[in-house]
Amino acid sequence: MSRPIEWSPENGAAVCLVEEYNYPMAIRCYKCNVLFDITGLPYTVDAFIEKHDSITSGMEGNQCRIKDLGDDWKKGLFSNFFFKTELSDTEEKITCTNCVWSRNVLKNSYYTRGMIKYAHDNESPACIIKNTEEMKTSDSWQYGNSCDVNFMQMETPFKKFTNKSVICSSCMTIIAGRDEHPTFGGFVNSHFINNPHCKDMDFLKNLSIDSRRIVVIANLDDFPDYNSDTSSSEGESSVGDEITYYNADEFTEMFGDDSDDDSDDEGIEDLSAYDEAMSVNDVDYKDVKERECSFSTWPKQMKQDSKEMAEAGWYYTGKSDRVRCFHCGITFGGWMPDDDPWSIHKLMEKETCGWLEFNPDKIPKVLRYIDDEGGEDKEEDGGGGGVIEFPKNNKEVENPKRGSCKACYERKADIAFIPCGHVFSCNICTMEMFASYKKKKRCPMCRVHVEKVQKIFLDEDEDMA
């Protein structure tokens, strides 16, 4: 199969990129983000541009027309993108010289600079390279140990937290150095991903831009030691006295190694002090489109659809598979392939979420009757109050049949919860209730933990009348 031509500034094709999706070959426009299939098209730039313009012309509100853009604009799309490439016998390592983002590709494999740029910009959104005009003509980016601006001697909010991480004293965000030689820009980028709302973020970005063409390798020993500065007032933040401080061993033991993305997360993960502090309404993600965009770096192996996740109120935190509700602030990780975003949200909410109340029809029927306020998952043992209350004016349940399922009122209630023994629902509704509930399954009547379920068989005389 013939390959598309190399898209370079010289041939005016920098406006799009070629990517592997569910199509044999697809193109995404940098300007309007439209993705379209080019299977069967001639492998020419003009054919791709014509296909793009024909699609966008039929899209309401999309005014992007590549053919109307000047060549200078097209060529400029590549000019602010600089990587150092290290060659080995079998592969090339393409590395961003500012944030240490990297991508390994097989030697002699087909890829364009556009592909690499797109991957970088999505996985490292805070990297300043794509926003710095003075770097457009430079090819001299190299790692360095010195710089006109010595960040380590300047008063920054970064302090050494462990041998591999720093902590921002303004917002208490912990930033791990994920590379053997972390850079100052890399710490700023990771900080932006984890907490873009830090009051010192603009200050940090400006410092990072001042690095010019030299990338500062961050020696963690040059940062002030956070653990020894217990009485300093610099570390005050909006968290106040509620924040809990951990030493390095306690932090690793409680929260694990952030670099392990394959950890067996189960249900709601134990939240760090930062997660607890941020469990509030996030107005920046109140727009469903903003939430959907946050899933641009969602792990490819995850089966949940980004649009459905966004509609259910979730946005991606950028860490492992952890997501957060923009409205109630609940955080969840450890998604299974068949987990439903709406069901998980309902089952995991600590308090009644206004977003779920606003979208009651999206929640599976059997989950709408669970009263979480009387039986939150805060207790480790036994049940707690919170008996199910059913709507009295529901036409479907005005005259329920004897022995019918308390969720659908259509089938027999033939599933017993062990050990409490309550018979509440039918087999189908029970599966729907527990399919997305990975741990701490509770009886919806008495809130006792359900260890197992048992199908029961009723005599014909006891069948529904």
From Swiss-Prot:
One example GO MF annotation: zinc ion binding
GO biological process, one term: regulation of cell cycle
CDD domains given in the database record: BIR
The protein, known as: Putative apoptosis inhibitor ORF106
UniProt superkingdom: Viruses
Disordered, as annotated region: 373-393
Organism: Ostreid herpesvirus 1 (isolate France)
Pfam (any one): BIR
